[in-house]
């Protein structure tokens, strides 16, 4: 019975990165051997056990064979006669197919260390093409390690292209897809994730609404990058640079979907794209069963981001409607995330990355002015129901008129 540290823990140690999760593989053991030593079984598809003291996962060495469509269409075989090399060959990338024994000796049958040094993401074997989830995983690793100079090997990108064209991506469940997408969006360079999916043809299968943005022009005066797809990648990049949460990053990715529906005869203008894009945002949200907070912010940013950019020009009544749409009185954080997404949209333009965004503080001040209006004096007057609501709205409007008057240039 030999125990090896495998996968990400080995990869990240060699990269000089912090090691968070450690996976172990056990060679030459059976389920009975593990139980005798006090390991607790937790695996449903294949034998995985928790260490009796550390609770870390230990999996029996196994092989796998394609038996159906999708990432779940595999038959696994785990037994004491499965070798370490057989276990490692089923893994996705060479940099994830290395193992280390208790003395730190490296087992690297597929040249993972060489690819690590060359900064290449390369598949281990042709069996890579049997699992469509690996398209998303490789794109996610590309997003994680782009800052270290990693790129996807051309032959691996070609396999990803073949997988995308095969239709197998449609077999991925919403939950598994969203898990990979959400993790990728929180990497250091999430725009690389979208770019790689675009390059291998997977984006048109997974999110055709986003794919449709590439090649769609915008007015050069406002968007020197011109291409809407390139703009969205830049907005997403800015959201990562500024360390924004998943809600903001998801909204940044989807905010301009309406531009993909603009007739070519109307290019490069995109009148009412905020409204036309809402059904597309909703469709993407539903496709991946996106968490409610991400869904809500994406729809609100899609609908109102132009209001955000024109905040200083808005009439007090329009500003009040905007604040009401976000329920800033009970959900101030959601409005703050809206402001963040708008600012990233403004910065996600070539040459505008460092441009100030005075709209942000103006919107925060407007929200504060509206929130500080007290309902108590109105209650003391005996107002209630619709009468109370109308009076409170009127007081907030007065507060915003005063606020705007104090900010006239």
Curated annotation (Swiss-Prot):
- Sites binding Mg(2+) sit at 21, 23
Q: Extract one GO BP annotation from the record.
A: RNA repair
Q: What family is this? A: Belongs to the tRNA nucleotidyltransferase/poly(A) polymerase family. Bacterial CCA-adding enzyme type 1 subfamily.
Report the gene name.
cca
Q: Name one Pfam family in it.
A: PolyA_pol_RNAbd
InterPro entries associated with the record: CCA_bact, HD/PDEase_dom, HD_domain, NT_sf, PolA_pol_head_dom, PolyA_RNA-bd, tRNA_CCA-adding_enzyme
What Gene Ontology molecular-function terms does this entry list?
A: ATP binding; CCA tRNA nucleotidyltransferase activity; cyclic-nucleotide phosphodiesterase activity; magnesium ion binding; phosphatase activity; tRNA binding
Annotated residues for binding of CTP: 8, 11, 91, 137, 140
Could you tell me what this protein does?
Catalyzes the addition and repair of the essential 3'-terminal CCA sequence in tRNAs without using a nucleic acid template. Adds these three nucleotides in the order of C, C, and A to the tRNA nucleotide-73, using CTP and ATP as substrates and producing inorganic pyrophosphate. tRNA 3'-terminal CCA addition is required both for tRNA processing and repair. Also involved in tRNA surveillance by mediating tandem CCA addition to generate a CCACCA at the 3' terminus of unstable tRNAs. While stable tRNAs receive only 3'-terminal CCA, unstable tRNAs are marked with CCACCA and rapidly degraded.
Ordered alphabetically, the record's keywords are: ATP-binding, Hydrolase, Magnesium, Metal-binding, Multifunctional enzyme, Nickel, Nucleotide-binding, Nucleotidyltransferase, RNA repair, RNA-binding, Transferase, tRNA processing
What PANTHER family is this protein classified in? MULTIFUNCTIONAL CCA PROTEIN
| Subunit and interaction comment | Monomer. Can also form homodimers and oligomers.
Domain HD intervals: 228-329
**Reactions listed under catalytic activity:** a tRNA precursor + 2 CTP + ATP = a tRNA with a 3' CCA end + 3 diphosphate; a tRNA with a 3' CCA end + 2 CTP + ATP = a tRNA with a 3' CCACCA end + 3 diphosphate
PROSITE patterns tied to this protein: HD
Other known facts? A single active site specifically recognizes both ATP and CTP and is responsible for their addition.
Report the protein name in the record. Answer: Multifunctional CCA protein
Q: What is its EC number?
A: 2.7.7.72, 3.1.3.-, 3.1.4.-
Co-factor note (free text): Magnesium is required for nucleotidyltransferase activity.
Q: Which residues bind ATP?
A: 8, 11, 91, 137, 140
Q: Which cysteines are joined by disulfide bonds?
A: none
Q: Does the keyword Transmembrane apply?
A: no
Q: Which cofactors are reported in the record for this sequence? A: Mg(2+); Ni(2+)
Q: What is known of its domains?
A: Comprises two domains: an N-terminal domain containing the nucleotidyltransferase activity and a C-terminal HD domain associated with both phosphodiesterase and phosphatase activities.
């Amino acid at each position: 019975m030999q125990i090896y540290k495998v996968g990400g823990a080995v990869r990240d140690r060699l990269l000089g990165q912090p090691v968070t999760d450690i996976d172990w593989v056990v060679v030459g053991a059976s389920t009975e051997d593990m139980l005798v030593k006090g390991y607790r079984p937790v695996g449903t598809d294949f034998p995985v056990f928790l260490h009796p003291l550390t609770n870390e996962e230990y999996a029996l060495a196994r092989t796998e064979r394609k038996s159906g469509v999708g990432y779940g269409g595999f038959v696994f075989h785990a037994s004491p006669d499965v070798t370490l090399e057989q276990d490692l060959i089923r893994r996705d990338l060479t940099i994830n197919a290395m193992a280390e024994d208790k003395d730190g000796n490296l087992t690297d049958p597929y040249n993972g260390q060489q690819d690590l040094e060359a900064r290449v993401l390369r598949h281990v074997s042709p069996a890579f093409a049997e699992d469509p989830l690996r398209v998303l995983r490789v794109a996610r690793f590309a997003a994680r390690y782009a800052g270290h100079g990693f790129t996807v090997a051309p032959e691996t990108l070609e396999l990803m292209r073949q997988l995308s064209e095969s239709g197998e991506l449609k077999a991925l469940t919403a939950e598994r897809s969203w898990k990979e997408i959400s993790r990728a969006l929180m990497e250091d360079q999430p725009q690389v994730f979208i770019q790689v999916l675009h390059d291998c043809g997977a984006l048109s299968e997974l999110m055709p609404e986003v794919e449709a943005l590439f090649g769609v022009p915008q007015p050069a005066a406002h968007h020197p990058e011109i291409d809407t797809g390139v703009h969205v990648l830049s907005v997403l990049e800015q959201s990562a640079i500024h360390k924004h949460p998943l809600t903001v990053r998801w909204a940044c990715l989807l905010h301009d979907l309406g531009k993909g529906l603009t007739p070519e005869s109307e290019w490069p203008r995109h009148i009412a794209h905020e409204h036309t894009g809402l059904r597309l945002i909703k469709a993407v949200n539903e496709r991946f069963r996106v968490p409610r907070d991400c869904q809500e912010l994406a729809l609100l940013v899609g609908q109102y981001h132009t209001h955000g950019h024109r905040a200083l020009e808005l009439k007090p009544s329009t500003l009040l409607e905007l604040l009401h749409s976000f329920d800033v009185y009970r959900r101030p954080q959601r409005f703050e995330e809206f402001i963040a997404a708008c600012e990233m949209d403004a910065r996600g333009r070539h040459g505008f990355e460092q441009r100030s965004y005075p709209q942000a503080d103006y919107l925060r001040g407007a929200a504060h002015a509206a929130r500080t209006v007290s309902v108590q004096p109105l209650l003391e007057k005996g107002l209630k129901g619709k009468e109370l609501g109308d009076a409170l709205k009127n007081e907030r409007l007065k507060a915003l008129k005063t606020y705007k008057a104090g900010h006239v240039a």
